[in-house]
């Protein structure tokens, strides 16, 4: 059996760098737009009280390597009061009556509420391993005895992910109409050359599957790039306020912000994130009743600001939510048109292994991040969403050598994107990546790649696996699913099944296996024999 001669120590880098985090090679001078500056709104979100709010905690949070990119000022007399955390004083309080939200699953809910799964009761059947239908009433013992964030939802899930709400939004037109700094901004990226600000925002939204409105809202709130001018020299180079020279420039600043939001959004979905750790050394538990979108916003700002400043930033009347509403209108009404993200009884459509029968491939990566390079020295020991797996064609050479083997369509659909190493196939055929099931084939070579607009049937040729798109040290296919704009975890309540093979996650990223009956294929970065898989003629 042929193997892939790739050094294990470097193979682990193959997909963790799939986000194609570009280098900033230079930023040209940007002309100052004519006319009055459109910002600020009737309040200054950066004028906050820096006095630390101390809450009791028995845990000493780890040091977060980030600096504040602002100068705190005193609080004006008429400053709105801080949103105070809620607190459950004892174990003898009434149980929570919690209505399940879209994307909820029992293990994650149990983790958020510090309860055992067996303690959670409902009239619905909770023995199933599927997602819980939205609106299902759950009775949960009150085990939360720490201060928590406010139980105030400030951002719907549909406004965080690249959902249906993003279909009719024109980034370029909106930015041009605002006539702020971003409308005239350009930067040089190693992966694309010169790119305009709006084009960079749009590409980041599509590739990271994040709502472009949210990207603009964050950029405006932290630096005023969208409707006016940067608030100071620091925010010109570090518009998201993350003061680290490795992240100098708009695109890499936004990549940092989007990665943090994804860590929180999908960590909340999975039940692996329950606390916020602030740069001032304080820690706060996340209220278990919040939705993933709200947690994503709370988490991002907790990485940038002290707890007292954060409390004012998340204030729905005077903080970031107010700025966002001023920019984009009623977010909840817009989200209602896209909800629920995951409808009841959702199942994956039938998928085939994404390569031709009787050809030798290897499972070189178990479940890992769908998109994004998450360096633990920057982001901590966290992960976003383990939605992707890797297949590599068997080869005698390894590295980025071309392959003659074909990646094939796992299901019929419309090719809605074919660029930068990515082929995205829309299975419902409506032409929108933001709706229904979508399958991502990543690292597809430009030569022989199926063009955008093509309808493919199952088994039709997509292209050849390669190292194109992102950072890769070996020819392979990075394969992932999305539904309604949200990455779907590979080993979760909607299992990733191809030709009867089910994906099972390992203890760490890239570990795992495929299981079909009594057959097992174990992921191995160098393609050893236990990772070999050959699709049968009748599969």
Model-derived features with residue positions:
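Acidic, glycine-rich catalytic/binding loops that coordinate metals and/or anionic ligands
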Residues: 349-351, 397, 401, 408, ...
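Catalytic glycan-binding domains that act on GlcNAc-containing polysaccharides
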Residues: 155-313
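Extracellular LysM carbohydrate-binding repeats and other cell-envelope/extracellular binding modules
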Residues: 19-28, 35-37, 68-99, 108, ...
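Zn2+-dependent peptidoglycan hydrolase active-site motif and core
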Residues: 401-452, 474-476
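Non-catalytic cell-wall polysaccharide-engagement segments
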Residues: 20-26, 37-42, 243-364, 369, ...
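Primarily a LysM-type cell-wall glycan-binding module
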Residues: 31, 35-56, 81-116, 136-138, ...
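Short glycine/threonine/proline-enriched tight-turn/helix- or strand-capping micro-motif at secondary-structure
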Residues: 343-346, 362-409
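Short alpha-helical segments in extracytoplasmic peptidoglycan/chitin-binding modules
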Residues: 100, 105-123, 135, 205, ...
């Amino acid at each position: 059996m042929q193997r892939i001669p790739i050094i294990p120590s470097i193979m682990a880098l193959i997909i963790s760098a799939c986000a194609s985090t570009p280098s900033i090679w230079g930023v040209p001078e940007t002309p100052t737009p004519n006319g009055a500056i459109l910002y600020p709104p009737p309040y200054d979100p950066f004028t906050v009280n820096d006095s630390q709010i101390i809450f009791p905690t028995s845990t000493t949070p780890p040091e977060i390597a980030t600096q504040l990119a602002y100068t705190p000022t005193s609080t004006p007399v008429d400053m709105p009061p801080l949103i105070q955390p809620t607190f459950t004083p004892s174990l003898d309080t009434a149980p929570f009556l919690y209505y399940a939200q879209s994307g909820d699953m029992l293990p994650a809910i149990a983790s958020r509420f510090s309860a055992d799964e067996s303690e959670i009761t409902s009239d619905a059947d909770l023995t199933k391993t599927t997602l819980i239908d939205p609106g299902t009433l759950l009775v949960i013992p009150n085990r939360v005895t720490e201060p928590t964030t406010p139980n105030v939802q400030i951002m719907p899930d549909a406004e965080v992910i690249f959902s249906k709400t993003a279909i009719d939004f024109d980034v370029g037109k909106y930015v041009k109409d605002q006539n702020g700094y971003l409308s005239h901004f350009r930067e040089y990226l190693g992966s694309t050359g010169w790119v305009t600000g709006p084009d960079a925002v749009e590409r980041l939204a599509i590739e990271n599957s994040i709502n472009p409105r949210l990207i603009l809202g964050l950029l405006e709130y932290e630096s005023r790039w969208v409707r006016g001018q940067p608030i100071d020299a620091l925010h010109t180079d570090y518009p998201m306020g993350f003061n680290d020279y490795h992240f100098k420039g708009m695109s890499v600043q936004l990549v940092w912000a989007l990665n943090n939001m994804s860590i929180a959004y999908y960590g909340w979905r999975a039940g692996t994130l329950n606390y916020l750790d602030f740069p001032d050394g304080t820690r706060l538990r996340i209220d278990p009743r919040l939705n993933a979108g709200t947690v994503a916003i709370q988490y991002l700002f907790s990485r940038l600001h002290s707890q007292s400043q954060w409390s004012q930033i998340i204030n729905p009347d005077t903080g970031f939510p107010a700025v966002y509403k001023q920019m984009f209108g009623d977010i909840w009404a817009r989200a209602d048109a896209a909800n629920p993200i995951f409808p009841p009884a959702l199942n994956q459509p039938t998928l085939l292994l994404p390569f031709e029968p009787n050809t030798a491939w290897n499972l070189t990566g178990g479940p890992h991040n769908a998109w994004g390079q998450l360096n633990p020295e920057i982001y901590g020991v966290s992960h976003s969403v383990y939605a992707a797996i890797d297949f590599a064609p068997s080869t005698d050479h390894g590295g980025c050598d071309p392959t003659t083997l074909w990646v094939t369509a796992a299901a019929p659909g419309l090719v809605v994107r074919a660029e930068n190493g990515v082929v995205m196939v829309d299975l419902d055929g409506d032409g929108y990546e933001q709706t229904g099931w979508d399958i991502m084939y990543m690292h597809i070579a430009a030569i022989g790649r199926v063009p955008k607009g093509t309808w493919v049937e199952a088994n039709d040729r997509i292209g050849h696996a390669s190292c194109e798109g992102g950072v890769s040290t070996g020819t392979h296919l990075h394969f992932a699913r999305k539904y309604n704009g949200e990455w779907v975890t590979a080993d979760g309540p909607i299992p990733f099944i191809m030709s009867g093979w089910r994906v099972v996650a390992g203890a760490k990223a890239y570990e795992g296996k495929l299981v079909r009956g009594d057959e097992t294929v174990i992921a191995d970065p160098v393609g050893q024999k236990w990772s070999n898989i050959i699709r049968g003629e009748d599969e």
